[in-house]
UniProtKB/Swiss-Prot annotation:
It is a single-pass membrane protein. It comes from Bacillus subtilis (strain 168). Belongs to the polysaccharide deacetylase family. This is Putative polysaccharide deacetylase YheN. The chain crosses the membrane at residues 15-35. Residues 85-271 form the NodB homology domain. It is an enzyme of class 3 (hydrolase). It is found in: Cell membrane. PANTHER family: GLYCOSYL TRANSFERASE-RELATED, POLYSACCHARIDE DEACETYLASE YHEN-RELATED.
Length: 282
């Protein structure tokens, strides 16, 4: 039958329909590819490098910080490589008249350390505190009195001393820290109720795994003590971090270059304590 003008043939209609369907299908496939790429991008983990060279998953860490303490500890234990050759130099009871010289030694050796400081001494040596913060050292708190009886006197006395020290540090530097070390170490004096009060306010308390005994020797003999304890930990295949206790003392500063050089010769690197690590309690 002859078609009249203006009427489309069945074959033309069918062909147009097929082209339209194909175009819609292509658009849908393109949208699926774009959406799939977008989802994979948003799901990509945000990873940063911490000051001790370890990788930290920011989103996972933030989520776990709001989760239960047990899950957080489990997470940190898997994230923290505690068996590597990293040492953490920590200095208590400062700042003091020799802290500036101590910072000179660390700067010359390109080493960062962690300082647990007392509130009255921070007020006395403000410039040393500011310099330590500016040069990238980790700043922690050691309380106020450094008196065993007063510090551990009540369930809230450690908390109050750390809060005062935290306020002092923040007034001087604008920096707020949660890292604390209690005088003479947490054991056996720090009670369960005192621990709960500290942790409730966000404080993370640290002890040490290596006591340099610089407070006892007051000379370079502490270097030998540190190296011997490190060797013992290596032989025991310990998975604990090498956290070295020292103090802002003249003899400690005098022998510090020797200690740092010997540690470097043995292949150790240096890190600072931070809130992504599992604290040690001796």
């Amino acid at each position: 039958m002859r078609q009249t003008r203006g009427e489309a043939s069945p074959s033309a209609v069918s062909l147009a329909f097929k082209f339209a369907s194909l175009a819609v299908l292509c658009v849908l496939l393109l949208l699926m590819v774009i959406l799939g790429y977008s989802n994979s991008s948003t799901k990509a983990k945000e990873v940063t490098v911490t000051t001790n060279g370890q990788l930290r998953d920011e989103k996972e860490s933030l989520k776990l910080k709001n989760d239960s303490p047990d899950l957080l500890i489990k997470h940190l234990q898997t994230k923290q490589n505690m068996g590597d050759k990293t040492v953490y130099l920590t200095f208590d009871d400062g700042p003091s008249a020799v802290t500036t010289r101590l910072l000179d030694v660390l700067k010359s050796a390109d080493v960062k350390a962690t300082f647990f400081m007392l509130s009255p001494r921070m007020n006395e040596f403000k410039q040393a505190v500011k310099r330590a913060e500016k040069e990238g050292h980790a700043l922690g708190l050691h309380g106020v009195t450094h008196n065993n009886r007063l510090f551990y006197q009540t369930p809230t006395s450690p908390l109050k001393e750390m809060q005062e020290a935290r306020d002092t540090l923040q007034d001087i530097t604008g920096y707020k820290t949660d890292l604390v070390r209690t005088p003479y170490g947490s054991k056996p004096s720090l009670t369960a109720s005192q621990i709960r009060n500290l942790e409730k306010d966000g404080f993370v308390y640290w002890d040490w795994t290596i006591d340099s005994m610089d407070w006892k020797y007051r000379n370079s003999q502490y270097v030998t003590a540190v190296l011997q304890q490190l060797e013992n930990m290596e032989h025991s295949s310990s998975s604990r971090p090498n956290v070295i206790l020292m103090h802002d003392l003249p003899a400690t500063v005098n022998a510090l270059p020797v200690l740092i050089n010997k540690l470097k010769e043995k292949g150790y690197s240096f890190g600072v304590l931070e809130d992504t690590m599992v604290p040690v309690h001796e």
